[in-house]
Amino acid sequence: MAIYTKLNHQNIQLLANDYDLKIIEFSPLDGGSGNSSYLLKDEVNSYVLTVCDDKRLEEVTKLGQLLLLLKSYNVPCNRLIKTVNGEILTTYTISKSIKPVILKYFIEGQVVKKLNESMLIQVGRKVAQLNKIPSPDYLPKNHPYGRHFFSKALGLAIDNRYESWLSEEIVYLDNKIIPNLPCGLIHGDLFYDNLLFKQSLNKPISFKAIIDFEEACNYYLVFELGMAIVGCCSNDITIDLKKARAFVHGYQQVRKLKDIEKESLQLFVHYAAVATSYWRFNKYNIEEPRKDMIGHHWQMVELSKEVFKISTTRFFDAIFNSD
């Protein structure tokens, strides 16, 4: 990932002064799109300092507020550090641009691309814990790359076949998503690389944390499950229904799904794949064009089609019915 804002030791220490820290070592981290992150170390702890290149102060303040809220509910996630003045963020000014900066404790853990069923049960429990937290008023009511934004990709003549397909998906989803589905606080981007695990000597691997809450919103709770199944239970071609079953099983140990959510889950797995295709198309063809990623959205198009092909009875039985 690109480092948008390049900081030297002097820059780092000036920012660290706002937290009364003396930094002895730092290095850039691979970060999410739209921000620049650095691993900092002092004599005691390790930290992650993030310069939010593409977000406004208001957005980052809300993210900080959310992280503080999650801490109060003991959700295993990034722990925000306030400045010595009690502020959620500080700022870095470059070329007359003021960029928000946040500091979090570094979480030691590993990303696992291929999650097994035991790991997915653990993830399901923690995601359900998150989804039971009352959603704060400051979170958006639409998902940042949900269907309400799909029309932004239409009429651009960048990929006519994709744009035509997406226009049909907008109509399909608008007609199929039923009213009165439960909404609440969701992470919104539960792919495997937003989960950390801990491997201890002579012990099974255990869940450590959920990270990167930039897409958090007050949205359909079943969308959270759909995205997690796409992001953690697929093999790039289709969904592994045994893994999806394990995730949902763990989830329901903490939060029981309503019947309308169970009946809508397959639709929302499909929806999550469509939404991810839109994110990739928008990211790599419009916002940050990359020749090597220009067709990356098609993988999610094909996944969404494979989910659609599964009979509703087979999908429901595989996820919810006892053997």
Residue ranges and their predicted role:
Residues 1-84, 198-205, 320-323:
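Conserved NTP-binding catalytic cores of kinases and kinase-like/nucleotidyltransferase enzymes
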Residues 17-24, 168-179:
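Short Pro/Gly-enriched beta-strand edge/turn motifs at strand-loop
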Residues 35-41, 48-49, 80, 171-223:
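Active-site acidic catalytic loop and adjacent metal/ATP-binding pocket
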Residues 42-137:
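ATP-binding pocket architecture of kinase catalytic cores
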Residues 113-162, 183:
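A cross-family kinase active-site recognition segment
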Residues 222-256, 271-287:
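Active-site activation/catalytic loop segments of kinase-like enzymes and analogous catalytic loops
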Residues 259-269:
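All-alpha amphipathic helical-bundle segments outside canonical DNA-binding/catalytic cores
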Residues 276-323:
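ATP/Mg2+ or Mg2+-diphosphate-binding catalytic cores
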